[in-house]
C-alpha cells in the first residue's frame, strides 16, 4: 500500500524521470511503500498495482510486454488501430492511457463473455476470466473489482 511518504517521495523522483526507466520504477514503488498490513485490509485501486503487473509481464514475456500484448492478444483479435501511452518505465501504461476503437472494445466484451476464447482459440485462460469477473473485492454500492475488471449491476427497464 502506498503511503503519503511514498507520494511525497514520488514527487521528488519525478523531477528526474530518467532514474525511473525500466525496473527502477517498480523498485521505487517497493522501496518507498510500507509493508502490506495484516487482514483486514482496505481496498484501494491504485496505479502502482497495475504497473507491477506490467513489469512482471515484461520480465516473463520473451519479447517483452508490449510485443506480447500486440502479438498474442490484440493481433489475434484483429485489433490494429490503437494507441497506448507509455509510462516513465518505458512500458505501456497499465492503469490508463490506451485508446481503442469502440468496435474493438466490443471485441474485449465478447472475449470475456466467451470465457477467454476468441473465434475458437483460448487467448486467456478460462480460470483467469472466472476469477477476474468474480466479485473479489467490494468497492462501493454494487461495484466489485476482480483481476483488472470492474463489475457492477445496473438496471435497465427494471431488469438487472
Predicted features and spans:
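Surface-exposed patches in mature extracellular/periplasmic domains of secreted proteins
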Residues: 44, 84, 119-121
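Short, flexible turn/loop "capping" segments at secondary-structure junctions
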Residues: 49, 85-88
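Active-site Gly/Thr loop motif
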Residues: 79-81, 130-160
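Residues that flank catalytic or metal-binding motifs in active/ligand-binding sites
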Residues: 94, 101-104, 128, 143-145
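A conserved catalytic-loop motif detector
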Residues: 110, 118-136
Amino acid at each position: 500500500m502506498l503511503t503519503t511518504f511514498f507520494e511525497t517521495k514520488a514527487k521528488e523522483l519525478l523531477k528526474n524521470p530518467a532514474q525511473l526507466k525500466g525496473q527502477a520504477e517498480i523498485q521505487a514503488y517497493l522501496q518507498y511503500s510500507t509493508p502490506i498490513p495484516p487482514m483486514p485490509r482496505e481496498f484501494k485501486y491504485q496505479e502502482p498495482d497495475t504497473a507491477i503487473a506490467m513489469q512482471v509481464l515484461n520480465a516473463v514475456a520473451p519479447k517483452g510486454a508490449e510485443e506480447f500484448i500486440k502479438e498474442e492478444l490484440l493481433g489475434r483479435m484483429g485489433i490494429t488501430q490503437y494507441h497506448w501511452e507509455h509510462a516513465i518505465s518505458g512500458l505501456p501504461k497499465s492503469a490508463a492511457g490506451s485508446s481503442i476503437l469502440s468496435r474493438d472494445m466490443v471485441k474485449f466484451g465478447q472475449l470475456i463473455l466467451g470465457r477467454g476464447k476468441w473465434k475458437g482459440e483460448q487467448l486467456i485462460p478460462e480460470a483467469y476470466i472466472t476469477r477476474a469477473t468474480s466479485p473479489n473485492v467490494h468497492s462501493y454500492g454494487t461495484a466489485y473489482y476482480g483481476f483488472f475488471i470492474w463489475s457492477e449491476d445496473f438496471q435497465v427497464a427494471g431488469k438487472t
